[in-house]
C-alpha cells in the first residue's frame, strides 16, 4: 500500500467553476531541488493570464509539508473532448510555448489525474 500526505499552501485559492464544466484535471509537479520549484512557479504564474485565455484555473497550490519541491493545480472542463481542444489550442499559443521551453527544465516529474465530482460535492 502506498500513502502520501501533503500540506498545501494556496497560491491561487480554489474557485468553483461557474460554467466551465465538472471534468477536473489535477496536475502534480515535482521540481528539481535547489530552487526549481520557485523558478517554475514564477514562470507559471507569469504565463497564467495567457493560459487562462484558453481555460480558467480552479486552483494552484505549493506543498508546505510532505513531499518537498511540489506544486499542483486543477483545471475544469465540460468534457474530455473540450480538454483535448483547450490543450491543443494552448500548445499553439506563443506565450505557452515559451513557458514550456523554459519551465519543463525546472521539473523532475509530472502526474495528471482526471477527476469527476462525487454526487455530494460542491464542485458539481
Model-derived features: positions:
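Short S/T/G/P-rich N-terminal loop/turn motif that feeds into the first structured element of a domain
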Residues: 1-124
